[in-house]
UniProtKB/Swiss-Prot annotation:
Subcellular location: Cell inner membrane
Record lineage: Bacteria, Pseudomonadati, Pseudomonadota, Gammaproteobacteria, Oceanospirillales
Predominant subcellular localization, coarse grouping: membrane
Name under which the protein is recorded: Putative manganese efflux pump MntP
Membrane topology classification: Multi-pass membrane protein
UniProt keyword Transmembrane helix present: yes
UniProt keyword terms in alphabetical order: Cell inner membrane, Cell membrane, Ion transport, Manganese, Membrane, Transmembrane, Transmembrane helix, Transport
Pfam families for the chain: Mntp
Function: Probably functions as a manganese efflux pump.
Transmembrane intervals: 3-23, 39-59, 65-85, 109-129, 133-153, 166-186
Keyword Manganese attributed: yes
Source organism per UniProt: Alcanivorax borkumensis (strain ATCC 700651 / DSM 11573 / NCIMB 13689 / SK2)
Molecular function, one GO term: manganese ion transmembrane transporter activity
Length: 186
């Protein structure tokens, strides 16, 4: 696979993480660039690891994973999205302590993993072509880090306009990303 094709693949793999990051950025209260970059690194790291895992699986059991990957991603993103919508419709918007937990490491990692399942499937397919999986994974991780950082900051602008409804927007965004992944595989 040539370098241009690898770059296109890397940015294609980052699009669903970018969409989720816009939703995440909308619910954060004025995230700083350093916070957006930290979240980008988490997403990028997970997005870089999943093609490696997929590549290893592709060497052994590709048909089992490919049959279910889109359903897993859709389910995880829908559950996370519904929870965000629920939180956004609470009359008090939740306590300040609860708001601080919305971007907890666990929740961030779950969202990142949910949006990276397609990268795992790509890793499975990369097992069958001549590609340096280490370079491909690194490029996917770097592209995702960049796109998520941009998405968080773009979401910040959306969140300041939408106020407490930003969480509903974020939840709907996650559900839409999950539906997009599911639709693309059916």
């Amino acid at each position: 696979m040539n370098p241009i094709a690898l770059l296109l693949l890397a940015f294609a793999m980052s699009t669903d993480a970018f969409a989720a990051a816009i939703g995440k950025g909308a619910i954060l209260k004025k995230p700083r660039l350093t916070e957006a970059f930290r979240i980008g690194i988490i997403f990028g790291s997970i997005e870089a690891i999943t093609p490696l895992v997929g590549w290893l699986i592709g060497k052994s059991a590709a048909s089992y994973v490919e049959a279910w990957d889109h359903w897993i991603a859709f389910s995880l993103l829908t559950v996370l999205g519904l929870h965000m919508i629920y939180e956004g419709t609470r009359p008090d918007g939740g306590s300040e302590e609860h708001k601080a937990q919305k971007m907890s490491l666990l929740r961030t990692c779950l969202t990142a993993f949910s949006t990276s399942i397609d990268a795992m499937a790509v890793g499975v397919s990369l097992a069958f072509i001549n590609v340096n999986i280490w370079i491909a994974s690194a490029l996917i991780g770097l592209a995702t880090t960049l796109m998520v950082t941009i998405g968080i900051m773009l979401g910040r602008a959306i969140g300041s306009v939408m106020g407490h409804r930003a969480e509903i927007f974020g939840g709907l965004t996650l559900i839409a990303v999950g539906a997009w992944i599911l639709y693309g595989q059916l």
